[in-house]
Amino acid sequence: PVHKIVAEYCAADYLIKRITDPVDVLTLTKCLPVIAPNGTARDELRGLLGWMAALGNRSVQESIIELDAYAVLANGDPSQLERSSKRQLLHRLKEIEAADPYFRRSDFWRRFSAAGFFTQDVVEEIKPLLTMGNEGHLRGLILELLADAPVNCQLAPELSLLTLNSNESEHIRTLASRCLLNIKEYDFIGALAVLIFEASNISLNIAAKIIEVAGPEKFNPTYLSGFLRVCANLYPDHKAQFERVVGTRYFIKKLISYFSQHTLELLLDELTHNLHCHCGKKSYECDCRNGISKIVGSMVDRYFELAQAPFDSVRIWQWIGNLNFHRQCQPDQSKSVQVLRENDTLRQGIITYVFGPLTDRKEIFNIRVEKFDGHLHSHSGLHLWRNDYKFILNLAFETDNVDLWTSFLVNHQRYKNREEQGPDDLRAQMRQHTLSKPAFMREWARF
């Protein structure tokens, strides 16, 4: 809280002025037994201790650093420390970690900024701390504080090594990559190649962040589509119902949100070109399109968020026609499902393109069942509504496509409740068709 920090600063300023006054009887030795009895700083007074070090002279700084080095770094303004005090602080923190690797304890999740602490005179002291291979808190703490430091460019080799090392923890690699992202001169192309080749969840997450910061428009669409194809391998098969960690692939959706409409169109064309099942299994068993279907589905959602009607129905079908899902999605969960269900013109444009040329009744039946009858594994927006049946019957009648018309013949609704029974507008429409063309009457009579 701000009021607490102000109170700590004012109290420290008052005490330091008295301690450094040669005629005042108050000394640091007299204050410490109250602030840190038995050499252990009170938790509620660690902020006061940190500000006293920041405002005090070299002697005061050295004494407080020896007492509680972490309090000096985490509180007050460590950038005000003298050069020798900064070095002493780093050495003292290293000693503390050697005795207690997890010295931050519950303070681990705290975030604070001390970027001004890292200046040219401490760069050489930092390098060995970054390259040590232990799992203590010190290295992570330093990386957190380095995020906005101006000396990152001098630490680029060490930071790059941490980022690209697959044996490092996710926490360390992520922090190191954030430091690299603040180096304007750093060449990320080589790092991206290593991260994408590793193809782990952590490495691809870092790579996605690099692409976000650099700007997706700076990358060739072929490069981006290749990256997304690698990301598709992160998705499990349909039998893996539960995952221990939720949201590990959220970075893919976040990256997609940075794509422009033009970039999305190019990527969707690239990713769905010649997309088909290559495992030969039934759609409910097929896992070879899981990842790419999820990614393309998210991209189509983003496309509909950006694009305005009218839409190119043929292109939309090419994007979503061969996707395979193992769960249905509702309109409030997916923008593409919402648009496809609400936009009759788009949906019926797709219907015209798909069914219009077909004359093989078996093929019509298979496409209808697998893609448009609310099938569990097709895109949830591809669903035929009652007005779509009317549209298809009229389309077939106008184009003299008897086979298509016959494939959508409507039965008598004999099993409806008595109060729901009555005239059927679809059958009435079909009867009108049969009165106009004998070919349709023959099928109607046979039916």
Residue ranges of predicted features:
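Leucine-enriched alpha-helical scaffold segments used for protein-protein interaction
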Residues: 5-201, 216-230, 242, 254-258, ...
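Intrinsic disorder/low-complexity flexible regions in very large eukaryotic scaffold/regulatory proteins
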Residues: 155-156, 188-192, 220-227, 260-271, ...
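Polar helix-capping/helix-linker motif
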Residues: 115, 165, 248, 313, ...
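Amphipathic alpha-helical segments within extended alpha-helical solenoids and repeat-rich scaffolds
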Residues: 199-204, 231-236, 270-280, 316-328
